[in-house]
Amino acid sequence: MEDLMTSYSFTEKKRIRKDFGKQRSILEVPFLLAIQVDSYREFLQEDVEPNKRKDLGLHAALKSVFPISSYSGNAALEYVGYKLGEPVFDERECRQRGMSYGAPLRVTVRLVIYDRESSTKAIKYVKEQEVYLGEIPLMTENGTFIVNGTERVIFSQLHRSPGVFFDHDRGKTHSSGKLLYSARIIPYRGSWLDFEFDPKDALFTRIDRRRKLPVSILLRALGYNNEEMLAEFFEINTFHINPDEGVQLELVPERLRGETLNFDLADGDKVIVEAGKRITARHVKQLEAAGVAALAVPDDYLVGRILSHDVVDGSTGELLANANDEISEDQLAAFRKAGVDAVGTLWVNDLDRGPYLSNTLRIDPTKTQLEALVEIYRMMRPGEPPTKEAAQNLFHNLFFTFERYDLSTVGRMKFNRRVGRKEVLGESVLYDKKYFAERNDEESKRLVAEHADTSDILEVIKVLTEIRNGRGVVDDIDHLGNRRVRSVGEMAENVFRVGLVRVERAVKERLSMAESEGLTPQELINAKPVAAAIKEFFGSSQLSQFMDQNNPLSEVTHKRRVSALGPGGLTRERAGFEVRDVHPTHYGRVCTIETPEGPNIGLINSLAVFARTNQYGFLETPYRKVLDGKVSDDVEYLSAIEENEYVIAQANALTDAKNMLTEQFVPCRFQGESLLKPPAEVHFMDVSPMQTVSVAAALVPFLEHDDANRALMGANMQRQAVPTLRSQKPLVGTGIERAVARDSGVTVNARRGGVIEQIDAARIVVKVNEAEIGGGTDAGVDIYNLIKYTRSNQNTCINQRPLVNVGDVIARGDVLADGPSTDIGELALGQNMLIAFMPWNGYNFEDSILLSERVVEEDRYTTIHIEELTCVARDTKLGPEEISADIPNVSEQALNRLDESGVVYIGAEVRAGDIMVGKVTPKGESQLTPEEKLLRAIFGEKASDVKDSSLRVPPGMDGTVIDVQVFTRDGIEKDKRARQIEESEIKRVKKDFDDQFRILEAAIYARLRSQIVGKVANGGPNLKKGDNVTDAYLDGLKKSDWFQLRMKDDDAADAIERAQKQIQAHEKEFEARFADKRGKITQGDDLAPGVLKMVKVFLAVKRRIQPGDKMAGRHGNKGVVSNVVPVEDMPYMATGEPVDIVLNPLGVPSRMNIGQILEVHLGWAAKGLGRKIQRMLEAQTAVSELRKFLDDIYNHDSAINAERVDLSQFSDEELLNLGKNLIDGVPMATPVFDGASEAEIKRMLELAELPQSGQTQLYDGRTGEAFDRKTTVGYMHYLKLNHLVDDKMHARSTGPYSLVTQQPLGGKAQFGGQRFGEMEVWALEAYGAAYTLQEMLTVKSDDVQGRNQMYKNIVDGEHEMVAGMPESFNVLVKEIRSLAINMELEE
């Protein structure tokens, strides 16, 4: 049992989850962002020495395009290596300034010029140079990219793997419903090659899905003639022609099977098969046994058979018959006459040897290779006159050259496996023995030498005809063995290669000049196309998305997303049901639950928790090995293709203490089916019960009790939870909350172990353990700067809070600070609320939610949102716009929040419509009235040639200004506010660096003191030779004088020298870093063209929960808050405690998400146990008793294989601390598919001294009467979703109108109105409310004169309206006239 105990880190000791899992975890949850981080690391290969780089990523792309030779061949540009520079701005600066985070790519190339005169290509001269090839975006630690100041994620694509696929049309093409088989060779890049049957059983080919050609044309173009084609595809029967009558057949008995002969088949006198009877397998065996080698058959048996070779008269050389002719009686007579001894015919029959290629040859118009090439040229380039050269080049470039065609390693591996070859490696072009043997360039000779006698195209056609003949099966394209994942790195490489190919064309042009004019590589290469391609991909590709940053879970899930859409993938409209459906191979690779609802359902998936990609890009999942019924801890990853061969048991298969499978028959999966097998036949077993689901679904407790549709909503809605002001860990979790928070990157984790030295709200300083300190200038101090109140992509607030205190001892990986939605390093998306399931005055009709006022008072669901408002001053034609506090026609009061530069103060509380940045725009000269002229004359020019264009707070928003940033264009003088911000920023950075240096210095001196105190000195300030160095002596010395000590001991002397060097090195480094930072702060900003100044104002908006906000549990139980009721009116328990939330019980049965009920019961038990611990602590119970109670909670009912909680590791103090943290409730973990059972929940309720039914008597808060039956009450983790009524609701009086129809716009963003749609019109019609209807359709909508007149009437106090002609009617008239139908209104 001991080996199942785990040791706890500092953070974990603060709070331990009671785990109900029966299976101990074999594999820890892997690093969740690995698919992104690893893929991009392989693309960059930044830390790999140039000569050791693998053929991947940037290196592979550069290698494939270089060397570039000039057209004459006298100059070439070769690739040597590349290196990435340092990024100019770090991540934080890029976010602030709206820049992209990337590093410059410098490629070393070598220009080689050959001597024209010499025949041996002697080198004239060589020049090597570094060339800048644009910025390459860098990935942040958390797997995101910063593009133009915003964080973006590039998610992976699931696309069809390159290779060869066989399929049929499911009988849809032809009216007879006949299955037409087809094959398609898909390369990684290059032309697709299809083969397909038509209803008449002829075989055709298509190139790039153009019009079809008989397949024999393609083979003829490769160099095969009719005889060779027939010999490749058919077996041949040989007939010997007797000179006078009859024919001898060389008999292969097997080939007669299924035939019906019109003569007796006999062995000597013994008749084996009578005439007219069908020959069966038994007859064939008899013939083989009898050893019949030849068979005499009548002439008419030969007539109508197909010749395999041309038949020539030996004496005259006359052609008697062509290959593929059906033999006629006349031809047979001619053969006899010419003395032809033997002829070969094709062995075909209707059952399993179809004459497909023979049929095809009959419809093939071409006779020679050139004709075939010309035919292909005409199909690819219709309308262009073909020449021999052009036709040959076009055909060669289609499939046989690396520049234009690439199967890739994956494609070649899939291709070879499918056509039944053993080796997985090979060429990335299509190889054909005949075609390459006829060419005599170097490359062709190499290919022929390596691959000799194979042919890719012939083998595909052979497999296709086999399938048509009924041997072999077609492929399933939704099988994950036929779909592979393309991750960031690979897509970036493809884009980079595309950019390089564009560069290559330009370089080729210039290389010829390089010879004559002596250009350098830098002058030859223009990096623009590469940079443009990369920028386009990262900025606006379909797969590059604005990161979903609502909470840590949404970040992690977004990065683990796998999409079938995007370039080279499917489109929403064309994707059918099969592609979207769950496939057996998804098990353990792609989540079967989490996918968006709506048009993208099934096309966008999430990786399963343990899934990873293999070297070929196929998804694989881990399994434990099983040998002779014993389950081992060895883990092996299998891809969908490999898994096909094995029998795999479920993770919850029963095992005993020795890990032997105990059941007689174990439930297993084999080749996509579920079945029962004896333990001896099992090969593997699942690693974990949550193997099938993704991270989001694995966070839903009791998932196994929820209906799949609701589980999907539950998983999706957790990603929309808004981080609350104070996060609360879920009382009922699943045990992977810690892993999600750790990998999301929102918490601060210790890089090295040590002791907390110093701490404040924005910084944590750790003094590192001696053992973990590196050599050199490493001073053994880690400084962590925390993120304070920053805006996320979704306008939620990112803020980190320290968790540790000075003096705490921490280990590597411990959580030092919590981020948004985390609580002591665990994901905490919502709040634990006391919930009752009961109706309450109709306020929970249709899933509405009734809240207690206490929830609002305690700020349980208060969230902070940070809005960024931008004001831009541009240079206009009439003059520059100006940011200032001097704004025409605005009251003093409106400006009282602005400083003299016209920018709002930090800390100002602003409401909708308030001015935040004053800005004036010059306006054109207009005709002045006499009054204005007078004002001009008195007050000078400035009075009215500018208009107010200030930045105001948008309607419906109020908040506090928390930050202001002013960006000024280079070369324009900064205003006072900008200078102030700059100075304070420099001060802050200086203080930061000073503090860091001081801490480092102190640490170095402290280490030095420990190394020299008590040692003998040879001399020093006020110290005689032979004296010992004491603490008191050192305290009396100035720090800088320590280095004057001369020590007797060499080690001590080295320590002093080393310390001095370290301090000097750090001082230098900090000075350099500060100078760099200072330069960045003071330099001008790189703003968009025409922009002089930009001011960003950040508003913090506090949103309390209110009716209209959307909330949800984790089981898809969503609803909208309908009412907030005073706490005294809420139902309460016998103890007097009122409930927080009342939910509708009718929302449970029909939705079948019973998990929420179990969660409520277990949550109540968890809270009850916490209260019990609180009572024990208040009563100051002995620690031993508390220890016993905790042991009873954690370890009472652990299963054989489950992990136990070892409380003996806890000192009494730590145990009391743990107890204090459990007062709020003992957190539980019920892992997915391995959770708490009903009995365990009941036991927990019993231990907490709560009713085992989970129900209790409630009383009505308004009357005090008991309700007529007991109610289910308990704690549920409830979330507030980012669908807030404040963001959705707005009011419009007069606003913008659409240009053509003159009807009000719609939507909050356009400040639009409410649409009065056709259904609403029907309602008014039904009531006969004619005048209301007229008003709705005219003056309140698009009757322009009418609505203006009505406004005047209201101003004048006349309450009447005249309805005119709606503008939409005029539009209709114009539309009809555009159809040339005149329509006039009669007066």
Curated annotation (Swiss-Prot):
Enzyme Commission number, as recorded: 2.7.7.6
Signal peptide: none
GO CC field: DNA-directed RNA polymerase complex
InterPro entries per record: DNA-dir_RNA_pol_bsu_ext_1_sf (IPR042107), DNA-dir_RNA_pol_bsu_external_1 (IPR019462), DNA-dir_RNA_pol_su2 (IPR015712), DNA-dir_RNAP_su2_dom (IPR007120), DNA-dir_RNAP_su2_hyb_sf (IPR037033), RNA_pol_bsu_bac (IPR010243), RNA_pol_bsu_CS (IPR007121), RNA_pol_bsu_protrusion (IPR007644)
Top-level taxonomic group: Bacteria
Catalytic activity as recorded in UniProt: RNA(n) + a ribonucleoside 5'-triphosphate = RNA(n+1) + diphosphate
The keyword Transcription is annotated on this UniProt entry: yes
Key words of the record: DNA-directed RNA polymerase, Nucleotidyltransferase, Transcription, Transferase
A GO term for molecular function: DNA-directed RNA polymerase activity
Record-linked PROSITE patterns: RNA_POL_BETA
GO biological process: DNA-templated transcription
Assembly with partners or alone: The RNAP catalytic core consists of 2 alpha, 1 beta, 1 beta' and 1 omega subunit. When a sigma factor is associated with the core the holoenzyme is formed, which can initiate transcription.
Record PANTHER family: DNA-DIRECTED RNA POLYMERASE I SUBUNIT 2
Matches recorded under NCBIfam families: PRK00405.1 (NF001616), rpoB (TIGR02013)
Function of the molecule: DNA-dependent RNA polymerase catalyzes the transcription of DNA into RNA using the four ribonucleoside triphosphates as substrates.
The family this protein is said to belong to: Belongs to the RNA polymerase beta chain family.
Protein name: DNA-directed RNA polymerase subunit beta
UniProt organism field: Xanthomonas campestris pv. campestris (strain ATCC 33913 / DSM 3586 / NCPPB 528 / LMG 568 / P 25)
Protein encoded by which gene: rpoB
